[in-house]
């Protein structure tokens, strides 16, 4: 039932507000993630031509709204995908925050709707709702939130939320409101997406599994008289050769011991997120079962919650794998790599120019303007690129 195939795609990067490292599961190779570092990553993404950046949310992260507000004036075109949290925020407060950040960024805000899938973290935030109730709250929240941002005055008495004279005095730049992104693999999540959301997100499962998931959501949306677009969240390990890429993947988990893997998998098992369960099932915590589809590697998910798979390979191979997902109807790719500053450049230089993006990316020049101390050949002339020499 694959729907429309997009001709062009959007490619976003990721701001690691929860930490960054050269290795997973160890403090070795870790680096301080502070505002100067996040500024470097954001400016790199802006310069290289990524469409935007995703900011994660939760108690393991710096607050996404505060960080995005700090980085907006330091960037020019970059969009910021920031989370609203039904159950943690009132819909009218979230609408005011959304409108303000959209205005001060001149329309560079994207909204990620996050229901939350860790019962212990939810309790720490004062949320004692079941899985089904959280999605009920999410749907009520979104119906109020969208109406308020659209300029309506809202009176609402629902099962979970009660709003009187809910309205917005200062509207957002984007009309009727910034695009809404959402990921949810349960039946309840798929229903909310089909009825309320602009772009449905999936984590990086094998293409056949992704196709089935998107078809199910697409069918629900059609029944609701709506049409969605689709995005996917993946890590990437791109190198000039396939051999180098797989060596880099092995190196990323080379400091990871079995006890750390077991501890992480125990945490994931307590969650009631269907998406997290699907991620964990791809590898079962077993190092020997990490290539789950051609060039799709589940090593990140041994210890990282959420997105746990990476595309691994040379530039042409990764571009081909991305095109496989595009042909399933996906038009938005939210990517990351460890460490995020270096990998933003590596992917941005090796792969991004090969992709059919609908936003401008940094052009590969015919020569390199560097400096007088060795980069320029013999201090006499500039090296030409391989493309211009061919």
From Swiss-Prot:
Catalytic class of the enzyme: oxidoreductase
Any one Gene Ontology BP term: alkanesulfonate catabolic process
EC number: 1.14.14.5
Stretches for region Disordered: 364-390
Signal sequence segment: none
Reactions catalysed, as given in the entry: an alkanesulfonate + FMNH2 + O2 = an aldehyde + FMN + sulfite + H2O + 2 H(+)
Lineage: superkingdom: Bacteria
Keywords: Flavoprotein, FMN, Monooxygenase, Oxidoreductase
GO molecular-function term, one example from the UniProt record: alkanesulfonate monooxygenase activity
Pfam family name, one: Bac_luciferase
InterPro entries: Alkanesulphonate_mOase_FMN-dep, Luciferase-like_dom, Luciferase-like_sf, SsuD_RutA_monooxygenase
NCBIfam families assigned to the protein according to its UniProt record, in alphabetical order: alk_sulf_monoox, PRK00719.1
Function of the molecule: Catalyzes the desulfonation of aliphatic sulfonates.
Protein family membership: Belongs to the SsuD family.
Name this polypeptide is given: Alkanesulfonate monooxygenase 1
Species in which this protein is naturally found: Mesorhizobium japonicum (strain LMG 29417 / CECT 9101 / MAFF 303099) (Mesorhizobium loti (strain MAFF 303099))
Gene encoding the protein: ssuD1
């Amino acid at each position: 039932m694959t729907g429309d195939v997009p001709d062009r795609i959007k490619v976003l990067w990721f701001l690691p507000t929860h930490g960054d490292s050269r290795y997973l599961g160890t403090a070795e190779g870790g680096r301080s993630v502070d505002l100067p570092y996040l500024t470097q990553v954001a400016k790199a993404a802006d310069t290289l031509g990524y469409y935007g950046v995703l900011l994660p949310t939760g108690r393991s992260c710096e607050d996404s709204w505060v960080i995005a507000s700090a980085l907006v004036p330091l960037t020019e075109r970059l969009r910021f995908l920031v989370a609203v949290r039904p159950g943690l925020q009132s819909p009218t407060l979230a609408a005011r925050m959304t409108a303000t950040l959209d205005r001060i960024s001149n329309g560079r805000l994207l909204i990620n709707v996050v229901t939350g899938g860790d019962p212990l973290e939810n309790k720490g935030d004062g949320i004692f709702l079941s899985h089904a109730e959280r999605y009920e709250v999410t749907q009520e929240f979104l119906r109020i939130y969208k109406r308020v941002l659209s300029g309506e005055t809202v009176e609402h008495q629902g099962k979970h939320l009660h709003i009187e004279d809910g309205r917005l005095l200062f509207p957002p730049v984007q009309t009727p409101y910034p695009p809404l992104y959402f990921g949810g693999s349960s039946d309840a999540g798929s229903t909310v997406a089909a009825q309320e959301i602009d772009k449905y997100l999936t984590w990086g499962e094998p293409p056949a599994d992704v196709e089935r998931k998107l078809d199910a959501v697409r069918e629900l949306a059609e029944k609701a008289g709506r049409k969605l677009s689709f995005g996917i969240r993946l890590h990437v390990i791109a190198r000039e050769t396939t051999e180098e890429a797989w060596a880099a993947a092995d190196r990323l988990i080379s400091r990871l011991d079995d006890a750390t893997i077991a501890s992480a998998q125990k945490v994931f098992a307590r969650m009631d997120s269907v998406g997290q369960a699907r991620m964990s099932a791809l590898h079962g915590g077993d190092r020997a079962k990490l290539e789950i589809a051609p060039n799709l590697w589940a090593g990140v998910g041994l210890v990282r919650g959420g997105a746990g798979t990476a595309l691994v390979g040379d530039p042409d191979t990764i571009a081909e794998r991305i095109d496989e997902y595009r042909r399933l109807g996906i038009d938005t790719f939210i990517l990351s790599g460890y460490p995020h500053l270096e990998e933003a450049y590596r992917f941005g230089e090796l792969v991004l120019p090969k992709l059919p993006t609908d936003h401008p990316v940094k052009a590969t020049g015919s020569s390199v303007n560097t400096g007088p101390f060795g980069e320029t050949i013999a201090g006499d002339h500039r090296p030409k690129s391989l493309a211009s020499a061919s």
